[in-house]
Amino acid sequence: QISEIKKKNIIIICIGTPIDEYMNPVHSVIKECIDQILPYLEKDQLIILRSSVSPKTTEWVSKYINNKKKGIDVVYCPERVVQGETIKEIREIPQIIGAFNQKAFTKALKIFSKISKKVVKATPLEAELSKLFCNAYRYIEFSISNQFYLISEAAGIDFKEIYKIMKKDYSRASNIPSAGFSAGPCLFKDTMQLASFFKNEFSLGQQAMLVNEGLVLSLSEKIAENFDISKLNIGLLGMAFKADSDDIRDSLSYKLKKKLEIDAKKVLTTDPYVKIDENLMPLNEVINKSNLLILCAPHKSYKKINLKGKPVIDVWGFLSNKKNNCKFF
């Protein structure tokens, strides 16, 4: 029962600020949550915001609550684990505590010092920006590799081979990610939240968005240049937004599907982890019925699949041609 909140010393809110169709943060979801719990809040309680929020959200929440009920501390402690690695990483990654005062920091320290040996003290705005900066940096990193992929394509060269050459025994290239679909519920959203905060002058992040989101359009153009798309059954392998996940939120696989469905004879989809899409088909059926296969999410289980000599588009450079005798585009 929500009324149980009044008996607790600490309340953790795991709701962030999504973005709307204009790429602006939406605060209404947090406000609705606060409005629901406000009647049950008591003096000296600590509220911890854990999810990604737009800059200065913690300040707004603190003022909003304390204008109605005094003596309630609000801190921002960003969750920074990689999806699928929470149990391992939550104890390894330093926990950031963004607090307005020492009293609030000390309260939060009591809980987070039990989770991790390392705690970093910050202001709420510093903590908010640290989370958004990290996600935006990663998003931009992916866009660089995707831009390299598109440049290689224009030059008629396989980026996978260039990628191997770049990284071969060269430490300064060790962190360059592969090309591939960069989407999901965090990186794109947080990059756009920074742009909104900075008066839409985050040109680097906005260009990264154009590259990452535009990769899908480039692939559809590539198909049209090499095939009569109207006669194609196209199979999409992996509909989750990332490898070895069942999360389809903001997945570029679905953006590609919608684009291809306009012109292709049929678009077939499969994913070993996704359970909520009724249109998914068994992997072998998709391979057998398709004239062209596109690797959208590089699930580990796909590493050994038999592609039966079908033409393949693999932006990730993940699949091997040694066993499949496929033509890669």
What residue spans do the PLM features occupy?
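Structural/interface elements that position substrates and couple domains in central-metabolism enzymes
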Residues: 1-329
